[in-house]
Regions:
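Residues that form or flank phosphate/diphosphate-binding pockets in enzymes
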Residues: 441
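ER/secretory pathway lumenal C-terminal domains and tails of membrane proteins involved
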Residues: 1-352, 359-429, 444-591
Length: 591
């Protein structure tokens, strides 16, 4: 009975400390990681704007003040023998020391390198960078369903940006408000956006249809919500990746939706198991069966890991629980925190590698259990050698044999070769527009690392809707000259000219063509009341014409070979703007 009571107390304490650990993790995630930098940014803004001190003065003062408070706290904790306070302060201190590595981001950005994403050169921009503001906000514990319609908006804060006279206000932060009946606890189906078909993915996954007007024929229930959590977020977006590493992989074709039995699934290599889950695998075409990433591990790493897990809990329950926490918080907890919407653009297995490491610990401990079993059969002397040999052949050797060919990146050079071909095909001092990460990063690598065609200016059109990226075009990069953006940094700051609607103006008859430069600089770029639309509650710049022209320098196009000497050359290029609303990235291209 005494032993049983000790066990109850032991496991009861484990559960309590697990909950405490979850709370501490939340405090660290929000309080330390986010609000320490937010407070430092607020101090810097006050010191710069309110006291006319240099940038970083308030930022530096905040952390000096914090260090002094920690020192006093440690001193008091030592005098009062408050051990938990001392431990907490030391933990907090070391977290800040580790967190301080993000200072290198500001140091690098302040040097204005040619590749300077987000331009994090001051404390206020660091706040947005670390807060992942560019990715938007999403609910975790309570929030809207994907079928909900916003009822109102609420101002949540002010956005600031470094300018020549201090930190200037560039707009407000808002969040949508929803009615309580359109919210749910622990929302997993929350994203109403269909830019990447997120909402439609939810609907298809849950069997929700559409009405003729495009609305959904019912709202998701809490059962639907949990079904999506387990069916998609945990099973498809975590467990599938987990089993790739420890059971086997069908092929390297991206799995874009659950129910696709052909692409990107996990397998075992054991026919009757795989056939039950994915259909008759022998009927797959040779292009998939002979895919280098068709890896059969026979679930041996997974089985050995389970053996090690049970062995660990049997021998050292406390240590096993620590490793379980690492496994949980770098796996399932990340699934819950990320709250990924459906139809992800790429596989996300890299996000959970920490939990794979934790499971690998149990694979190693599984060898000890195999050793104990073999000792009963073959004897204690030979058991360690035999267990090591058997496990080495059963797990690492098979993994090498099955996976080395598709994990060897030494000959996968298509991204680099395409980037080189793109750059080499351009005329001298050309401007090369790209779209998205996959198009752009190989080009940057080719230019920055291998020095291929540094005279070409690579412009990522996906980033042209952001002021800091447009401003970077004003400067010479490598051997490519600066670009005249027409508008000043003040004219595109923050949310200024984020979008510009078309509004006809009687002064501009719609049967004529107008010089694009003149329209952009002297109409769209001017804040005169008569040029602006006030119907939306605040003045918004407009563009008055859809027929525009660009003058052609005949001598230049003949000299550079764009046209032949025998060709006739137009005096101007004419085109029509088909859109009724131009966003900042559209305007940047036109400029």
């Amino acid at each position: 009975e005494a032993i049983d009571s000790k066990k109850k107390a032991y496991y009861g304490g484990m559960y309590i400390f697990f909950l405490i650990g979850c709370i501490i993790t939340g405090v660290v995630q929000v309080g330390v990681i986010q609000y320490s930098i937010k407070m430092a940014g607020a101090f810097d803004r006050y010191f710069v704007n309110g006291m006319n001190l240099p940038y970083f003065s308030g930022f530096t003062f905040f952390f000096i003040l914090l260090a002094v408070l920690i020192w006093f706290g440690l001193k008091i904790a030592a005098q009062k023998s408050w051990h938990f306070l001392r431990l907490g302060l030391w933990c907090f201190s070391f977290m800040l020391i580790g967190y301080s590595t993000y200072l290198t981001t500001m140091i690098r950005s302040s040097a204005n390198p040619s590749v300077d994403m987000y331009n994090v050169d001051n404390p206020m921009s660091l706040v947005g960078y670390l807060g992942r503001e560019q990715y938007g906000d999403f609910p975790i514990l309570y929030g809207q369903k994907f079928t909900a319609q916003p009822r109102d908006t609420k101002e949540t804060g002010t956005k600031y940006q470094k300018s020549k006279d201090g930190y200037s206000e560039i707009g407000k932060d808002f969040k949508y408000l929803y009615s309580p009946e359109e919210k749910m606890v622990f929302p997993r189906v929350w994203d109403a956006s269909n830019d990447q078909s997120h909402a439609d993915y939810y609907a298809n996954f849950l069997g929700i249809g559409k009405n003729r007007d495009g609305s959904y024929d019912r709202e998701p229930t809490q059962f639907d919500n949990i079904h999506f959590l387990f069916g998609y977020q945990i099973n498809f977006m975590y467990f599938r990746y987990f089993m790739w590493n420890f059971s086997g992989k069908q092929n390297d074709v991206q799995g874009t939706y659950q129910g696709n039995i052909r692409d990107g699934n996990w397998i075992t290599g054991i026919n009757f198991i795989d056939n039950m889950r994915l259909g008759e695998q022998s009927k797959l075409p040779d292009s998939l069966k002979l895919n280098k990433a068709h890896n059969k591990l026979f679930a041996l790493p997974f089985i050995l890991g389970l053996i090690g897990l049970f062995y660990h809990f049997k021998k050292k329950g406390g240590d096993a629980f620590v490793n379980f926490l690492l496994f949980f918080f770098t796996g399932f907890a990340i699934v819950i925190y990320l709250n990924q919407a459906g139809n992800q653009p790429r596989e996300r297995d890299y996000a959970y590698v920490g939990s794979f490491y934790a499971f690998a610990v149990w694979i190693g401990l599984g060898v000890l259990q195999i050793k104990d079993w073999l000792a009963k059969v073959a004897g204690a002397n030979i058991a360690p050698t035999l267990a090591t040999t058997v496990c080495l052949l059963a797990v690492p050797a098979i993994m090498v044999q099955q996976e080395w060919d598709d994990h060897d990146r030494s000959k996968k050079v298509i991204a680099r070769d395409l980037a080189k071909d793109y750059l080499e095909s351009c005329a001298p001092n050309a401007i090369l527009f790209t779209f998205g990460d996959n198009d752009t990063y190989p080009l940057w690598y080719a230019q920055e690392v291998e020095g291929i065609r540094p005279d070409i200016r690579v412009i990522n059109s996906s980033l042209l809707g952001i002021d800091w990226y447009i401003n970077q075009l004003r400067y010479k990069v490598n051997q490519s000259d600066a670009i005249d953006v027409i508008w000043s940094a003040d004219q595109i700051e923050g949310r200024k000219r984020d979008y510009v609607p078309y509004q006809a103006n009687v002064k501009f008859p719609d049967n004529a063509y107008y010089d694009l430069y003149d329209v952009m600089k002297n109409y769209v770029g001017v804040d005169k009341p008569e040029y602006m639309d006030n119907s939306r509650g605040e003045p918004i710049n407009t563009f008055p014409v859809k027929k525009v022209s660009i003058p052609v320098d005949k001598d230049a196009v003949l000299k550079n070979g764009t046209v032949n000497a025998t060709d006739s050359v137009l005096s101007e290029l004419r085109f029509d703007i088909s859109k009724d609303r131009l966003f900042k990235n559209d305007l940047a291209v036109l400029n």
